[in-house]
C-alpha cells in the first residue's frame, strides 16, 4: 500500500452556542482535513484545528507544512513501513504539531485498513467507559452557573470552568 497523494481541505462547523475564553470568542470550529490516498484506493483521514491563538498553528501554517514538507516526505512510501514513516513525519519539519498530528491520524487510519484492524484496537483496545468533561465558557456568573447546571443535567460530572 503505497502513498500516492495527500489532499487537503477545509471545513467549518457552526457551534450551537459561541464558546468564549479570555483569548477569543468562537462561533464555529474550523478544521483542516487531510486525506492520504494510496495505490490500492484506500484513503486515510486526519484533521487539524487551526488554533493560532493557542498553538501558533494557523490554517496557512498547517496547509503549508503539509503541502511543502510533510507530503513530499511521505508520498511514494509504503504504509507497511510504519515506524519509518513516523520517524520521517516527525523529522521533516520542526514544530508544526497540528499538521503532524493530522497526518499521524491519517497514517494510523491507513495502517489499520492495511491490516483490517480498527485503530482503537491498534492502540490498546476499547474502554468500557471514558471520563470526559465540558468547558463552561466565560460569561456573566449567573449564565455560567446556568451552563454548568445544564451540563450536569446532560450527564457531565466533570466541568472545566473558564474564569478569565
Predicted regions: what is each one?
Residues 1-32:
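Short, Gly/Pro- and small/polar-rich lid/capping loops
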Residues 5-7, 37-114:
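Metal- or metallocofactor-binding catalytic centers and their adjacent structured scaffolds
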Residues 26, 96-104, 140-145:
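Glycine-rich anion/phosphate-binding loops
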Residues 10, 50, 163:
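Residues that line or immediately flank small-molecule/substrate-binding pockets and catalytic motifs
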Residues 33-35, 45, 160-162:
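Structured core elements
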Residues 121-164:
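Metal-dependent enolase-superfamily TIM-barrel catalytic cores that perform enediolate-based chemistry
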Residues 31-33, 102, 131, 158:
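Broad gene-expression machinery/nucleic-acid interaction feature
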